[in-house]
Amino acid sequence: MSRSQADSTSASEKRTVRKVVARKFIERPKTVVIMAGGTGGHVYPGLAVAEAMHQRGFNIAWLGSRGGMEKELVAKASEQMGFDIAFSEIEISGVRGKGRMALLAAPFRVLKAIEQAKQILQKLRPALVIGMGGFVAGPGGMAARKLKIPLVIHEQNAAAGTTNKILRRFANLTLVAFPGSLKNGVFVGNPVRKDIETVAPPQQRFAQKEGPIKVLVLGGSRGALAINEMVPAAFGKVNKALPFQIVHQTGKDKLEATKESYALAGVKANVVPYIELMSEALEWADFAICRSGALTVSELAAVGLGAVFIPFPYAIDDHQTKNADFLVQCGAAVVKQQKELSPEILAVLLNELLAGRERLQQMAVKAKQQSKPHAAEKFADFCEELIHD
């Protein structure tokens, strides 16, 4: 072989290698970065979207806050869902309600967090960034804008948070869980777990129910003190002729105190720190007593279950009351403000609800009518369309 022929063969081989490398790069699954943290209300909808996007062939990465609870939740969910979620973190936390010094330092901390997020996104090179609300989404959204990466935001609450109010101005797409919470937001609902979406509809469930009214009390995974103390006392004052069964989730730190409260009230209850399979608990119940976080309201609607809401009184912009109104206005729920509530007042309402299942079934059916089925899939549809544009 002559030298010119060898050089020609070598050049041809190099072109072939370049084509193969280029093809592999093009065919490599695209990455989607999900930004969420701070509370389960931001993280769990993000995980539902992560699963939907992964099923469509996307790699999933997660941007959270250093020291946040989301790292553990994402790792656990990743194992359960059977695919890897690359977790990265930035140094950021909320400032509202933390005093003047926190406000003064906020601009510098935000700038630092934006730079951290920018470096992470440059490394990941995602096709899309999804902000699920909470303070961690702010710097990540700003970084996505700087890098000209498409941005989708989702607002879980009926009253939009500060982060999403800012990001909405330049996001490529704004999705909302409750109608009207953000200007020009597309109403898709809150993505919920698949096992909750597949619970039998209320008409079918209530046709099979008999015996004592079953009450699910959700004090929250962290424990809502007012619910854990007031509800046992209220059940101690209801009409003794009304049969009922109670499952009460307290949060791990309030377990023993809540058990003691039921004992003092002379009421039998199954008191647990945490409910692993919430879908089964919601299916079992005739109605729930709980806070009105965005995800709780959406899960009740998805299943079709009536509720007594006791909104967290210190929620920013009173967003829990606004969340509750979504089901209260259609007759699917009753709302009682904590400051106006006592065991005696709550007992009066419980006497009404424990009197029979007819009203409870009506509430459940109305809740189901407010649901947005397959929210995670619809969310993923919008994301995929934006990526392929």
From Swiss-Prot:
Catalytic activity as recorded in UniProt: di-trans,octa-cis-undecaprenyl diphospho-N-acetyl-alpha-D-muramoyl-L-alanyl-D-glutamyl-meso-2,6-diaminopimeloyl-D-alanyl-D-alanine + UDP-N-acetyl-alpha-D-glucosamine = di-trans,octa-cis-undecaprenyl diphospho-[N-acetyl-alpha-D-glucosaminyl-(1->4)]-N-acetyl-alpha-D-muramoyl-L-alanyl-D-glutamyl-meso-2,6-diaminopimeloyl-D-alanyl-D-alanine + UDP + H(+)
Enzyme Commission number(s) from the entry: 2.4.1.227
Signal sequence bounds: none
GO molecular function terms listed in the Swiss-Prot or TrEMBL record: UDP-N-acetyl-D-glucosamine:N-acetylmuramoyl-L-alanyl-D-glutamyl-meso-2,6-diaminopimelyl-D-alanyl-D-alanine-diphosphoundecaprenol 4-beta-N-acetylglucosaminlytransferase activity; undecaprenyldiphospho-muramoylpentapeptide beta-N-acetylglucosaminyltransferase activity
The entry's keywords: Cell cycle, Cell division, Cell inner membrane, Cell membrane, Cell shape, Cell wall biogenesis/degradation, Glycosyltransferase, Membrane, Peptidoglycan synthesis, Transferase
Family, as annotated: Belongs to the glycosyltransferase 28 family. MurG subfamily.
Residues reported in the UniProt entry to bind UDP-N-acetyl-alpha-D-glucosamine: 39-41, 157, 193, 221, 275, 294-299, 320
Entry's Gene Ontology cellular component terms: plasma membrane
EC class name: transferase
Name this polypeptide is given: UDP-N-acetylglucosamine--N-acetylmuramyl-(pentapeptide) pyrophosphoryl-undecaprenol N-acetylglucosamine transferase
Role played: Cell wall formation. Catalyzes the transfer of a GlcNAc subunit on undecaprenyl-pyrophosphoryl-MurNAc-pentapeptide (lipid intermediate I) to form undecaprenyl-pyrophosphoryl-MurNAc-(pentapeptide)GlcNAc (lipid intermediate II).
Domain of life: Bacteria
InterPro entries for this protein: GlcNAc_MurG, Glyco_trans_28_C, GlycoTrans_28_N
Localization per record: Cell inner membrane
Organism expressing this protein natively: Saccharophagus degradans (strain 2-40 / ATCC 43961 / DSM 17024)
Any Gene Ontology biological process: carbohydrate metabolic process
Topology with respect to the bilayer: Peripheral membrane protein
Record pathway: Cell wall biogenesis; peptidoglycan biosynthesis
Pfam families: Glyco_tran_28_C, Glyco_transf_28
